[in-house]
From Swiss-Prot:
Record keyword Transferase present: no
PANTHER family named in the record: SUBUNIT OF PYRUVATE:FLAVODOXIN OXIDOREDUCTASE, SUBUNIT OF PYRUVATE:FLAVODOXIN OXIDOREDUCTASE-RELATED
Stretches that traverse the bilayer: none
GO BP terms in the entry: organic acid metabolic process; sulfur compound biosynthetic process
Protein name: Ketoisovalerate oxidoreductase subunit VorB
Reactions performed catalytically: 3-methyl-2-oxobutanoate + 2 oxidized [2Fe-2S]-[ferredoxin] + CoA = 2-methylpropanoyl-CoA + 2 reduced [2Fe-2S]-[ferredoxin] + CO2 + H(+)
Amino acid sequence: MATQMVKGNTAVIIGAMYAGCDCYFGYPITPASEILHEASRYFPMVGRKFVQAESEEAAINMVYGAAAAGHRVMTASSGPGISLKQEGISFLAGAELPAVIVDVMRAGPGLGNIGPEQGDYNQIVKGGGHGNYRNMVLAPSSVQEMCDLTMEAFELADKYRNPVVVLTDAVLGQMAEPLRFPEEAVEHRPDTSWAVCGNRETMKNLVTSIFLDFDELEEFNFYLQEKYARIEENEVRYEEYLVDDAEIVMVAYGISSRVARSAVETARAEGINVGLLRPITLFPFPSDRIRELADGGCRFISVEMSSGQMREDIRMASGCRDVELVNRMGGNLIELRDVLEKIREVAGDSSD
């Protein structure tokens, strides 16, 4: 198995190519531009389709077209670009089209800056565009997972015929770490009997998200909710670190989880029983595990580079218990000392 030092954004394209992605449509935006750049280098070399579109809106609609024709297709963007794609993502969900979207989060709102943030949580995890739809959302915390979870995203997208978002951030996208290349490439042979492939067999197929009859659209919406319930039942993924005897559990994803893990080790050395729960899927969210820990008396700290968007999901999952927050915004990274200060504060309250 080959190992090479690569950037996170490059790892995304490596994962996509090994997963059998044969179409990439995008538009450059910092800090996600290397994904498009690497696709432009490597996709044509092996006979795959790459187009730098004239806009973010054009790119996501090209994704729609390729997905409707049964291709494995992806795009990537950040911040303002993701906002421009939201209508198309809603159309993908409404037409039940599989596609992978990578969001390399940067600081906002508005133009913001190109520093790292996790402020797109609500936008991506709650759907973002119009209507009653959900994205499946995977949250890598390393360059290795940038590759591996991109590969998994394509499998999940095909399995559920739904958009899957790989939600990462500017640090993970730009940092370099050793990447173990996948052992073998996926031979993409999903059931595309529903697709419009330009042949006699698929002439009867209709790929659309429009329902002119109110009752038919309502029935379709109920069907979608049943699909999302199956996803919640079967696809929850998370990682635990020293949680079994923990009295305090931090919940963190992405780059923030790496700071939180270091804080666990330091606090444990001080005799504080603290652990880390890292959601790998943000939708579906590990709500049942959080409720189980809450019922066992654990207290929670949300560690995130946002205003506390994930904290609301932790609060709901824990039965509306208080959830402490350690956060930074504006492109600033969470520092170890800030997390340790909050752990000591909560531990002190617990011992009173």
